[in-house]
Amino acid sequence: MKRIPEPFRIKMVEPIKMTTLADREIALKEAGYNPFLLRSDDVYIDLLTDSGTGAMSDNQWAGIMLGDESYAGSRNYYNLCSAVEHFFGYKLTVPAHQGRGAEQILFPALIERMRQVRGGETPVFISNYHFDTTAGHIELNGGKAINVVTEEAFDTTTPYDWKGNFDLNKLVETIEEHGSKNICAIITTVTCNSSGGQPVSMENMRSVYEIATKYDIPVVIDSARYCENAYFIKQREEGYADKSILEIIREMYQYGDMLTMSAKKDPMVNIGGMCCIRDHQELFQAVQTRCVPMEGFVTYGGMAGRDMEALARGLYEGADEDFLHYRISQVQYLGERLREGGIPIQYPTGGHAVFVDAAKILPHIPADQFPAQALCNALYLEAGIRAVEIGSLLLGRDPETGEQKASELELMRLTIPRRVYTNDHMDYIADALIELKNRAHELKGLMFEYEPPVLRHFTARFREID
């Protein structure tokens, strides 16, 4: 993939400040050795997430000034509905403040439908790989989240184009094991964040939908990074090279019945999400019923009118092919720099981040001492760069036994915000991590000082193990 320069001009900048090592040592200790608890002023380059951290365009900012803040029936809501139908073909839209808001109004409705319509008793959701908040919402509502991602996802060194794919045999086996009446939904996560921002092929999405249809199970598309997934399909899958991103997106969403979206990723807004349903009026009404007490009235769902307008415009900008080429190329550039420096990563690189294989860099730190978290802390001390753990810490404990689950992958995610950093920043990141690798054997594992019962990685506190 030939890299291109940024397909935009920079109109506004925000100064960032390098701190001293002594400053960073104090800041990290005060944060309980958890990068989530660092103050942003103490961070030089912030790679914690691409969620809500991108730069909006002049067109989106112009839309902000056209916000209709009517409590009910905002024109910006209808602009958003029009954009949703244009891209996805779904007619029913409920806004939410972000992706987890969409999940918390949809999942209980799916569980209720499983019990009342399907006669099920034990709610189960199956995904290629549930992300943390998705699994958290399922478990908080008494459900079980099961992942059936392809085995190739767990081999970080072997190139494979579709490391986000479902293992179709495991999918069928899981449905049969738990009984189709207990399966609330199959969740297709595009791209698959927990396996390294890896794409799902169109063929796999189609096959999953065929299996779901056979068993009468609805399919939810977790759509945080659907544009990046569409771009990978165009680049890698036979028969799609000459199709537009719009055409590919429209076909992808034929293989789903509804979607949840954190719009803070591909549409490049700072806040917002939505739950959209193809045409199931009864389910739509159930979601609306939960929206009012949980998120807000059904035509704003926790979002200001101005933010809905920015989101409607961002749906178009995120699907621009020139932007996507630049976006994926920048992530790939960082990945190649790291590989040249001997850093093991999930390969090929995914769409929104480079995932560093911390288990290979820190083989002396066991999974229950969180090697990827230790590497995140060391990178912050080295260069003021904030990354995030995707491994056993995020995976959590078995809800039935309380035992720590060992993740198949211990990854440090270097998440690249959209339209924010240049390749000079990528070089700085690569140089810092390559330098850190030379003293990786000195790093220590971590143990909890405070462990929250749910989604613990956000607010947990740690100490180093001597």
From Swiss-Prot:
Keyword Lyase present in the record's keywords: the answer is yes
Q: Which domain of life is it from?
A: Bacteria
Give the Enzyme Commission number.
Answer: 4.1.99.1
**Which pathway is it part of?**
Amino-acid degradation; L-tryptophan degradation via pyruvate pathway; indole and pyruvate from L-tryptophan: step 1/1
**Gene3D superfamilies per the record?**
Aspartate Aminotransferase, domain 1, Type I PLP-dependent aspartate aminotransferase-like (Major domain)
Q: Name one Pfam family in it.
A: Beta_elim_lyase
State the Gene Ontology terms under molecular function.
tryptophanase activity
Name the needed cofactors. pyridoxal 5'-phosphate
Task: Extract the NCBIfam families matched here.
Answer: PRK13238.1 (NF009709)
Q: What is this protein called?
A: Tryptophanase
Q: Which organism is it from?
A: Vibrio parahaemolyticus serotype O3:K6 (strain RIMD 2210633)
The UniProt gene name for this protein comes to tnaA
